[in-house]
Curated annotation (Swiss-Prot):
One GO cellular component term: cytoplasm
Functional description taken from the UniProt entry: Catalyzes the phosphorylation of pantothenate (Pan), the first step in CoA biosynthesis.
GO molecular function, one term: metal ion binding
GO process annotations (BP): coenzyme A biosynthetic process
Amino-acid positions noted as binding K(+) in the UniProt annotation, renumbered to this chain: 117
Protein's UniProt name: Type III pantothenate kinase
Record Pfam families: Pan_kinase
Needed co-factor(s): NH4(+); K(+)
The family this protein is said to belong to: Belongs to the type III pantothenate kinase family.
Active site: residue positions: 96
Keyword Translocase assigned: no
Pathway annotation: Cofactor biosynthesis; coenzyme A biosynthesis; CoA from (R)-pantothenate: step 1/5
The protein's assembly and partners: Homodimer.
């Protein structure tokens, strides 16, 4: 029996999970610097273990809260041991990317994995069936592609992807439709190419999709995938259990 606190500090928000016996019990979203809000959230509880991870500079107040509310705690850093072998410069690997691949490997061991995290950027991570992180690629995300076409051209309008149907014409009949079709078909083709490369490998394989745009992207790509929206949190919990 274990009751763990997982604090994942992003660039603009903080995600907090209560994990009981390796299952996520609840998830809370806190604003940027989560200090006081985090203190109120965890005050009624006493945790067995806790982990704090940040994609940027750590919040010292949040770190202190995490340390104080659990019997044992871990501050995620570039030297933190993980249950994978890495073929990547650890100093340049974001904590969220690393946690995602650890989470995927814990869910699907002995499997060739492609982990796709679809947020502001889209990351493609490869994990071998032997538990080796083979590396990854970073590409512009869905919203970023639309925004770049608007910002770096003279007259192209900004398209809001939130209202776009998954059924996109092959070719647009207006500038708006042309932008939409170009971005969506281009991104779908990019993702399908990575998936095809994975499935060309021998043995069991799986594609794991996570991130804010995961549900939409799942509808526009032709290949079978598994959606795990809380993959980073699961990975951080696995790293915590591995170390403490």
């Amino acid at each position: 029996m274990s009751f763990n606190l997982i604090v994942d500090q992003g660039n603009s928000a903080c995600k907090v999970a209560f994990v009981r016996n390796n299952s996520i019990e609840s998830i809370s979203f806190l604003p940027g610097k989560a200090g006081q809000a985090l203190s109120h959230l965890v005050a009624p509880h006493r945790f067995d273990k806790a982990i704090y991870s940040s994609v940027g500079l750590p919040d010292e107040e949040a770190e202190a809260i995490v340390r104080s509310c659990a019997a044992a705690s871990l501050m995620m850093g570039t030297e933190t041991p993980v249950p994978l072998r890495l073929q990547y410069d650890r100093r340049t690997l974001g904590a969220d990317r690393l946690a995602a691949v650890v989470g995927a490997h814990s869910l699907y061991p002995n499997t060739e994995l492609l982990v796709i995290d679809a947020g502001t950027a889209i990351t493609y991570e490869r994990v071998s069936a032997e538990g080796i992180y083979l590396g990854g690629n970073i590409s512009p995300g869905l919203h970023l592609r639309f925004k770049a076409l608007h910002l770096f051209t003279g007259r192209l309008p900004l398209i809001d992807p939130s209202g776009i149907s998954p059924k996109i014409a092959e070719y647009g009949s207006s500038t708006e439709e042309a932008i939409t079709a170009g971005v969506i078909h281009g991104l779908a083709g990019e993702i399908d190419r990575y998936i095809d490369d994975l499935h060309a490998k021998e043995g069991r394989s799986a594609v794991i999709l996570t991130g804010g745009d995961a549900n939409y992207l799942a509808r526009i790509i032709r290949s079978g995938i598994l959606i795990h929206p809380d993959l980073v949190l699961l990975g951080l919990n696995r790293i915590l259990e591995y170390n403490v």
